[in-house]
Amino acid sequence: MKKSIIIVLLFGFQLASAQKSNYSELIAKSGDKIEQKVIAWRHDIHQNPELGNREFRTAELITKHLQSLGIEVQTKVGITGVVGILKGDKPGPVIALRADMDALPVEETNGLPFASKVKTMYNGKETSVMHACGHDGHVAVLMGVAEVLAGMKKDLKGTVKFIFQPAEEGAPIGEEGGAYLMVKEGVLENPKVDVIFGLHMDSQVEVGNLTYRPGGTLAGVGDFKITVKGKPSHGSKPWFSVDPILVASQIVVSLQQIVSRNVKITDNAAVVTVGAINGGNRSNIIPAQVEMLGDVRAFTNEDETLIYSRIKQIAEKTAEAAGATALVELPYGVKYPVTFNNIELTNLMLPTLQKSAGVGNVFLVPANTGAEDFSFYAQKVPGLFFRLGGMPKGKDAKTAPPHHTPEFIIDDASFKLGVITFCNLVFDYAEMNKK
């Protein structure tokens, strides 16, 4: 009797392994077949970039493609967002895949034959627009994934939600947007999402490689604004003034001591940056006030609270000592939480990443002080966010143009691995979490 049970269990395990191997092989072949389509979509989107909450053409392209596959489509989610819902023929979990759609106000100078020449109005000024962060690749990859999975619908366990998100780089002034707004409008409900996966192109990781980190992988970020009010005077008679420029300068220098002297950096990194100082308009007039804008990046709530407290204390006390005042607003605007990769989920899906790229091409990396609004999804449901190498083979990561710069380049050869990895994550997770 025991021997029979063991044989049955062994047969079941072998059958499951064979089925898993079969769909992985089919996904790999499908990745080969769809690669040129994905590249063509990427070129089209790259040549026609759109800023946050204005991704009308991109959304229309996505919508038509999903509808052609017979996928249920919801439009205008979070202003310009598109959500596709693919129901497999077998019961299983609800798995979300996310791609962001927006471009940046950057003039492209990398010489690509499909480089952007688009110009638009941004903050009242005409500006060039460029996909300088790889979001064109994200969209093209997820469009490819949708086509592959739609073709495997009869074998698909559960439901896949394709989330095409606007405004990851931030909504226009005075508007809500991005993942925050999509979550607010219920993108993770109806049907309720069990788990979410996201990827990001990386121009300084070689094509064919994936990188990941369990736990806090990207920093939480919150902006701050400090308004220093002093007393104006003629520049020739500074003794009649309380100089807000001098006070602001002292505050900037003192803020840099927070990370080096107050944060336990052996546990987690943190960053305090002042990115803008505005005050005065003539060389011989000491102005009445100065405004400063900056941001804080941290990986724990404790560090964030500490840094905010010290910013307020330093600004107010420095100003008071000089006879000025400092109004501190923090967080100022939308605050992004830490992008946290669920540790159990990350460990569970690591073999899938390794299967997709090859064991030797998947790398554990340190936490990154960049920020991502994927964090709003991962706050609500278990999430895994990983990076997809986009640097041409043979290039030096130290000299590869970074994200958000005019020379930024992502190699077309990178996208097939993105398609394969997303598809494998869906099938492997569904296989391990049958309902």
Give the ranges of each region predicted by the language model.
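Acidic/His- and Gly-rich active-site-bordering loop/insert found
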Residues: 19-130, 140-157
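Short, flexible, mixed-charge acidic loops at enzyme active sites
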Residues: 108-119, 215-219, 393-401
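Metal-dependent amide/peptide-bond hydrolase catalytic core
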Residues: 20, 68, 249-435
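Soluble non-cytosolic domains of exported or imported proteins
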Residues: 32-36, 49-60, 132, 136, ...
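Bacterial Sec-dependent N-terminal signal peptides
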Residues: 1-21
